[in-house]
């Protein structure tokens, strides 16, 4: 492990402030290693801002190969891997609907990260904007004891997690759009505007009641 070294926190709440000090130390001749407790820095984790500041300051940046959840999830999804886009976490509120509408017609495989508390909501929205028949693979707990991949249509995967409590962090892989799927997605979107809401499962009701009691929105 790392011993006798000075450690400091560098995260999304302080990275703009800490990056300047780190770059100054680098310019002074020190070596700095940026690591995360899981995944790879810069991939849905802090790192981009510090790397950019270091490069602009003329500091050499080297990268060691590291693990990132979306690659094994993509490979094991059974969906095309030759062309894909990594979207990470969708906007929680503002811009979420607009982004989903834009992506619904993308021809390449798409990759999303999601928390267990929002995964059912996201799958519902995929059904709404992408169409219920769009192929999806939802992978959780990658490389851990309880790793699981649920594959099927967006509707089938959604229904699975409406009845089975989602646990662990998720990677959701979605197939790209064909002309036929584009037509179906538009029809589903129009239908969803007048359709009755999806019946709430016991798990969803439990989570909603907990959130209302805590007085907070679902966040990571």
Q: Where are these predicted regions, by residue range?
A:
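Class I S-adenosyl-L-methionine
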Residues: 1-64
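Short, hinge-like loop/turn segments at secondary-structure boundaries
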Residues: 2-4, 24-26, 51-53, 77-82, ...
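Short hydrophobic/aromatic-enriched beta-strand-loop microsegments
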Residues: 3-11, 61-62, 81-88, 133-139
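Short, well-ordered secondary-structure micro-motifs
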Residues: 20, 45, 73-75, 97-101, ...
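A charged, well-structured terminal subsegment
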Residues: 25, 95-111, 129, 180
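A contiguous loop/helix-start segment that scaffolds small-molecule binding in enzyme catalytic cores
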Residues: 30-31, 109, 113-220
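Conserved phosphate/pyrophosphate-binding and hydrolysis machinery centered on Walker-type P-loop NTPases
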Residues: 40, 44, 67, 90-93, ...
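Class I SAM-dependent methyltransferase SAM-binding "motif I" and its flanking Rossmann-like core
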Residues: 49-106
């Amino acid at each position: 492990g790392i011993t006798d070294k000075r450690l400091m926190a560098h995260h999304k709440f302080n990275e703009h402030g800490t990056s300047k000090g780190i770059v100054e130390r680098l310019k002074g001749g020190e070596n700095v290693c940026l690591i995360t407790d899981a995944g790879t820095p810069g991939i849905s984790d802090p790192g981009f801002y510090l790397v950019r500041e270091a490069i602009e300051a003329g500091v050499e940046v080297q990268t060691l190969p590291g693990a990132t959840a979306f690659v094994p999830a993509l490979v094991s999804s059974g969906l095309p891997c030759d062309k894909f886009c990594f979207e990470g976490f969708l906007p929680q509120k503002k811009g979420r609907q607009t982004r989903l509408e834009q992506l619904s017609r993308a021809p390449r495989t798409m990759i999303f990260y999601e928390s267990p508390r929002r995964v059912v909501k996201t799958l519902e929205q995929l059904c709404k904007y992408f169409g219920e028949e769009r192929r999806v693979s939802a992978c959780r707990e990658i490389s851990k004891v309880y790793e699981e991949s649920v594959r099927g249509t967006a509707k089938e995967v959604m229904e699975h997690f409406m009845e089975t409590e989602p646990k662990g962090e998720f990677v959701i892989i979605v197939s790209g759009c064909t002309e036929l799927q584009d037509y179906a997605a538009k029809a589903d979107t129009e239908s969803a505007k007048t359709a009755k809401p999806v019946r709430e499962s016991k798990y969803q009701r439990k989570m909603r009641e907990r959130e209302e009691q805590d007085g907070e929105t679902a966040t990571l």
